[in-house]
């Protein structure tokens, strides 16, 4: 599993075996987001299947040589500044409805996501997906000895990673905020 460093096709995938399912999913997502094809249900199915495969995989994954080259062309300070700006925007805005990030951002941190603890995480995640906001689950629970791992189970049920990467501008973060504000379900504990 990798995070996108840029919105470039070569960075949208990782090297695994010859299974092209994830690539098909990314193509469907792109077509759906551009309103060229109503394929969101199929994309969501592929997305879920790929997450399950990655969660249970013991295969060593690696980045392609072309992706490594593209990464060397990225302006890292600009990337960090954009991510930090998006993180701070959501921190200030979501405080208005009582939501706080799971952790504070230290001075030199470059956040990958905006981690948020919410009630009914899966329902909230589905709601966001209906509005074209896709949040990965970084804390799946394997159900191994849950009686000895209550915090792992709690994290799996309540943590969501909101997207804040450098592709998103202020209008995107405003859209995300507005969709969260409009959510009809209960988020606070």
Where are these regions (language model features)?
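Hydrophobic alpha-helical segments with transmembrane-like composition
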Residues: 1-2
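PLP-dependent aminotransferase class I/II
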Residues: 5-189
């Amino acid at each position: 599993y990798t995070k996108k460093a840029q919105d470039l096709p070569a960075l949208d995938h990782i090297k695994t075996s010859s299974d092209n399912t994830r690539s098909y999913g990314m193509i469907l997502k792109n077509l759906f987001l551009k309103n060229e094809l109503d394929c969101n249900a199929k994309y969501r199915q592929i997305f879920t299947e790929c997450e399950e495969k990655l969660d249970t995989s013991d295969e060593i994954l690696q980045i392609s040589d072309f992706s490594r080259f593209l990464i060397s062309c990225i302006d890292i300070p600009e990337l960090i500044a954009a991510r930090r700006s998006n993180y701070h925007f959501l921190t200030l805005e979501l405080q208005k409805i009582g939501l706080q990030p799971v952790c504070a951002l230290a001075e030199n941190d470059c956040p990958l996501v905006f981690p948020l603890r919410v009630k009914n995480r899966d329902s909230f995640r589905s709601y966001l997906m209906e509005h074209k906001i896709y949040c990965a689950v970084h804390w799946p629970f394997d159900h191994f000895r849950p009686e000895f791992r209550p915090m792992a189970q709690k994290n799996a049920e309540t943590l969501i990673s909101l997207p804040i990467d450098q592709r998103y501008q202020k209008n995107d973060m405003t859209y995300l905020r507005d969709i969260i504000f409009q959510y009809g379900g209960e988020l606070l504990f």
